[in-house]
Protein backbone atom coordinates (compact mmCIF):
# COMPACT_ATOMS: atom_id res chain seq x y z
CA UNK A 1 0.00 0.00 0.00
CA UNK A 2 1.29 3.41 -0.94
CA UNK A 3 2.34 5.45 2.08
CA UNK A 4 0.39 8.64 2.54
CA UNK A 5 2.47 11.68 3.47
CA UNK A 6 0.84 14.48 5.40
CA UNK A 7 1.84 17.59 7.30
CA UNK A 8 1.55 17.81 11.04
CA UNK A 9 2.69 20.02 13.83
CA UNK A 10 5.21 18.13 15.91
CA UNK A 11 5.03 18.79 19.61
CA UNK A 12 8.74 18.09 20.06
CA UNK A 13 9.52 20.97 17.75
CA UNK A 14 7.10 23.31 19.46
CA UNK A 15 8.25 22.39 22.96
CA UNK A 16 10.89 25.05 22.91
CA UNK A 17 11.56 27.54 25.66
CA UNK A 18 14.02 30.40 25.87
CA UNK A 19 14.29 32.13 29.22
CA UNK A 20 12.68 35.53 29.48
CA UNK A 21 15.96 37.33 30.09
CA UNK A 22 16.86 36.68 26.46
CA UNK A 23 14.14 39.14 25.42
CA UNK A 24 13.80 41.56 23.69
CA UNK A 25 17.16 41.42 21.91
CA UNK A 26 19.89 38.94 20.99
CA UNK A 27 22.59 38.10 23.49
CA UNK A 28 26.00 39.53 22.66
CA UNK A 29 28.32 38.74 25.57
CA UNK A 30 30.35 36.64 25.59
CA UNK A 31 30.40 36.87 21.81
CA UNK A 32 29.45 33.70 19.96
CA UNK A 33 29.80 33.55 16.20
CA UNK A 34 27.55 31.38 14.05
CA UNK A 35 30.37 31.33 11.52
CA UNK A 36 32.72 29.49 13.89
CA UNK A 37 30.75 27.74 16.62
CA UNK A 38 31.91 25.08 19.08
CA UNK A 39 29.62 22.78 21.06
CA UNK A 40 30.19 20.55 24.09
CA UNK A 41 27.68 17.71 23.83
CA UNK A 42 27.16 15.68 26.99
CA UNK A 43 24.74 13.27 28.65
CA UNK A 44 22.60 14.31 31.60
CA UNK A 45 21.65 12.15 34.58
CA UNK A 46 17.92 11.97 33.88
CA UNK A 47 15.93 9.22 32.20
CA UNK A 48 14.62 5.73 32.76
CA UNK A 49 16.89 2.70 32.36
CA UNK A 50 16.02 2.21 28.70
CA UNK A 51 16.65 5.84 27.79
CA UNK A 52 19.86 6.03 29.80
CA UNK A 53 21.12 3.04 27.84
CA UNK A 54 20.27 4.89 24.62
CA UNK A 55 21.94 8.19 25.50
CA UNK A 56 25.60 7.29 24.76
CA UNK A 57 24.68 6.13 21.27
CA UNK A 58 22.55 9.22 20.70
CA UNK A 59 25.38 11.47 21.85
CA UNK A 60 27.90 9.80 19.56
CA UNK A 61 25.55 9.88 16.57
CA UNK A 62 24.62 13.52 17.09
CA UNK A 63 28.24 14.51 17.68
CA UNK A 64 29.18 12.84 14.41
CA UNK A 65 26.37 14.43 12.43
CA UNK A 66 26.06 17.92 13.93
CA UNK A 67 29.06 19.59 12.21
CA UNK A 68 27.75 18.61 8.77
CA UNK A 69 24.17 19.45 9.76
CA UNK A 70 25.27 22.94 10.85
CA UNK A 71 27.20 23.51 7.63
CA UNK A 72 24.17 22.42 5.61
CA UNK A 73 21.73 24.45 7.71
CA UNK A 74 23.80 27.60 7.22
CA UNK A 75 24.36 27.10 3.51
CA UNK A 76 28.06 26.47 4.06
CA UNK A 77 28.51 29.80 5.85
CA UNK A 78 28.96 28.32 9.32
CA UNK A 79 31.36 25.79 10.81
CA UNK A 80 30.75 23.80 13.98
CA UNK A 81 33.23 21.83 16.06
CA UNK A 82 32.54 19.39 18.89
CA UNK A 83 34.85 20.24 21.79
CA UNK A 84 35.05 19.84 25.55
CA UNK A 85 35.95 23.51 26.03
CA UNK A 86 33.27 25.01 23.82
CA UNK A 87 31.16 28.11 23.26
CA UNK A 88 28.03 26.38 24.50
CA UNK A 89 27.08 23.22 26.39
CA UNK A 90 24.34 20.98 24.98
CA UNK A 91 22.90 18.41 27.39
CA UNK A 92 20.96 15.37 26.24
CA UNK A 93 18.23 14.94 28.85
CA UNK A 94 16.65 11.50 28.80
CA UNK A 95 13.22 12.69 29.87
CA UNK A 96 10.28 14.45 28.27
CA UNK A 97 10.15 18.20 28.63
CA UNK A 98 10.77 21.52 26.98
CA UNK A 99 14.05 21.76 25.11
CA UNK A 100 15.47 25.20 25.80
CA UNK A 101 18.40 27.57 25.65
CA UNK A 102 19.32 28.98 29.07
CA UNK A 103 21.84 31.69 29.81
CA UNK A 104 23.76 31.93 33.05
CA UNK A 105 24.70 35.31 34.48
CA UNK A 106 27.19 36.58 37.05
CA UNK A 107 27.01 40.19 38.11
CA UNK A 108 24.45 40.88 35.42
CA UNK A 109 26.70 39.59 32.65
CA UNK A 110 26.28 36.41 30.64
CA UNK A 111 29.05 33.98 31.52
CA UNK A 112 27.80 30.81 29.84
CA UNK A 113 24.90 29.24 27.97
CA UNK A 114 23.39 25.77 28.12
CA UNK A 115 20.94 23.99 25.87
CA UNK A 116 18.86 21.11 27.21
CA UNK A 117 17.59 18.74 24.52
CA UNK A 118 14.96 16.28 25.74
CA UNK A 119 15.12 12.91 24.03
CA UNK A 120 11.57 11.77 24.85
CA UNK A 121 8.27 13.26 23.67
CA UNK A 122 5.26 11.71 25.35
CA UNK A 123 5.61 7.96 24.81
CA UNK A 124 7.99 8.39 21.86
CA UNK A 125 11.75 8.09 22.06
CA UNK A 126 12.99 10.62 19.54
CA UNK A 127 15.26 9.65 16.67
CA UNK A 128 18.70 11.09 15.96
CA UNK A 129 17.27 13.06 13.03
CA UNK A 130 14.61 14.64 15.25
CA UNK A 131 17.15 15.48 17.94
CA UNK A 132 19.47 17.05 15.36
CA UNK A 133 16.67 19.35 14.22
CA UNK A 134 15.88 20.27 17.83
CA UNK A 135 19.55 21.03 18.48
CA UNK A 136 19.81 23.20 15.36
CA UNK A 137 16.66 25.05 16.41
CA UNK A 138 17.94 25.71 19.93
CA UNK A 139 21.36 26.80 18.67
CA UNK A 140 19.55 29.20 16.36
CA UNK A 141 18.03 30.86 19.43
CA UNK A 142 21.44 32.28 20.34
CA UNK A 143 20.79 34.87 17.63
CA UNK A 144 17.19 34.45 16.48
CA UNK A 145 14.53 35.66 16.48
CA UNK A 146 13.86 39.17 17.79
CA UNK A 147 11.95 42.31 16.89
CA UNK A 148 8.94 42.84 14.64
CA UNK A 149 7.37 39.70 13.24
CA UNK A 150 8.52 37.50 16.13
CA UNK A 151 7.01 36.10 19.30
CA UNK A 152 8.90 34.36 22.10
CA UNK A 153 11.96 33.86 19.91
CA UNK A 154 10.08 32.44 16.91
CA UNK A 155 8.57 33.87 13.75
CA UNK A 156 4.98 34.86 14.39
CA UNK A 157 3.75 33.85 10.93
CA UNK A 158 2.86 30.20 10.30
CA UNK A 159 3.97 28.15 7.27
CA UNK A 160 1.05 26.94 5.17
CA UNK A 161 2.90 23.87 3.90
CA UNK A 162 6.02 21.84 4.54
CA UNK A 163 9.39 23.24 3.50
CA UNK A 164 12.88 22.07 4.38
CA UNK A 165 13.81 25.75 4.82
CA UNK A 166 12.94 27.65 8.00
CA UNK A 167 13.98 26.29 11.38
CA UNK A 168 12.76 28.99 13.72
CA UNK A 169 9.01 28.42 13.86
CA UNK A 170 7.02 27.09 16.79
CA UNK A 171 5.36 24.76 16.17
CA UNK A 172 7.47 23.49 13.30
CA UNK A 173 5.72 21.97 10.29
CA UNK A 174 7.06 18.51 9.47
CA UNK A 175 5.95 15.63 7.28
CA UNK A 176 5.62 12.00 8.22
CA UNK A 177 4.98 8.89 6.15
CA UNK A 178 3.35 5.82 7.64
CA UNK A 179 5.94 3.75 9.46
CA UNK A 180 8.65 6.41 9.17
CA UNK A 181 10.16 9.05 11.41
CA UNK A 182 9.03 12.65 10.86
CA UNK A 183 10.98 14.78 8.39
CA UNK A 184 11.45 18.36 9.54
CA UNK A 185 13.11 21.52 8.21
CA UNK A 186 16.91 21.37 8.32
CA UNK A 187 17.98 24.66 6.71
CA UNK A 188 17.92 28.19 8.10
CA UNK A 189 15.98 30.64 5.95
CA UNK A 190 17.51 33.83 4.54
CA UNK A 191 15.97 35.95 7.27
CA UNK A 192 17.25 33.53 9.91
CA UNK A 193 20.73 33.69 8.39
CA UNK A 194 20.48 37.48 8.51
CA UNK A 195 19.69 37.31 12.24
CA UNK A 196 22.75 35.08 12.63
CA UNK A 197 24.95 37.53 10.67
CA UNK A 198 25.52 34.91 7.98
CA UNK A 199 24.13 36.76 4.98
CA UNK A 200 27.41 36.77 3.05
CA UNK A 201 29.34 33.65 1.97
Protein language model features and the residues they cover:
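Surface-exposed patches in mature extracellular/periplasmic domains of secreted proteins
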Residues: 70-86, 146-157
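Extracellular/periplasmic catalytic domains that process cell-envelope and extracellular macromolecules
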Residues: 31-34, 82-84, 104-111, 126-127, ...
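Disordered inhibitory propeptide/activation segment of secreted metzincin zinc metalloprotease zymogens
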Residues: 15-72, 103-109, 183, 188, ...
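Bacterial N-terminal signal peptides
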Residues: 5-14
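Active-site scaffold of zinc-dependent metalloenzymes
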Residues: 99-129, 167, 173
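Short, well-ordered secondary-structure micro-motifs within conserved domains or adaptor modules
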Residues: 80-104
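Active-site-proximal beta-strand/loop segments in catalytic clefts of secreted hydrolases
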Residues: 42-46, 85, 91-95, 118-121, ...
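The catalytic-center signature of Zn2+-dependent metalloproteases
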Residues: 126-201
